[in-house]
Amino acid sequence: LHGIEVPVQIQHGNTLNKPLSSWDDQVDVIITNPPFGGTEEDGIEKNFPSDMQTRETADLFLQLIIEVLNDKGRAAVVLPDGTLFGEGVKTKIKKMLTEECNLHTIVRLPNGVFNPYTGIKTNILFFTKGQRTQDIWFYEHPYPEGVKNYNKSKPMKFEEFETELYWWGDEADGFTSRVENTQAWKVSIDEVIARNFNLDIKNPYQEAQEVHDPDELLATYHTQQEEIAALRNQLKDILGTALQSSSNGDAK
């Protein structure tokens, strides 16, 4: 927490350990980097609607964020690529997100933002509750000149976002000042629906480039391994839920 040397009035606990329907407090702004790549303990998923239950932490937090936002409340949420392309419950959550909120911007971050803790590629989702999504703007955040990857001693800096800030515009007028360029492109909700809510949409202005740099190749390898591990956990979650449902059916 920037500038807070001695935090007070902070409660330690699991925010998800409470039925979703019991949240009465509503908030105007949420800025969060929820845990991702992990799963919750058995029973936590029961706090969520039966058709939206999962043990994957990031998916549960995204549902909670949508629930507790006020009408016209705004959120900025860091989520992994797996949320963008994931299916099953993830598809249902993304459908709900675009129907209940205006998911107006997704900033696609480069590899290594959270090095050395994780190499999973991440994104920042910006949305406002109370209006359906019509179009989603994507912005691909590039590495600064001369940088091939981030690390603990050379992390991402706020100054790198100056180009996004200049391009951002005003939500009040529907971001009419935004223009597509080599880093930014717009996708309609109709295209998103046709893709079954797969939001892993690549930059159409950037041709695929063959990479030979060893550091970049190694970073990509680690990212892919972590994404595989996340998908493996998701598959275990799906199979566990299916087996539990089957057991309950046999018991009846």
Can you annotate each of these PLM segments?
Residues 1-6:
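Short, conserved SAM-binding/catalytic segment
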Residues 12, 17-252:
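A conserved structural/catalytic subdomain of Rossmann-like adenosyl-cofactor enzymes
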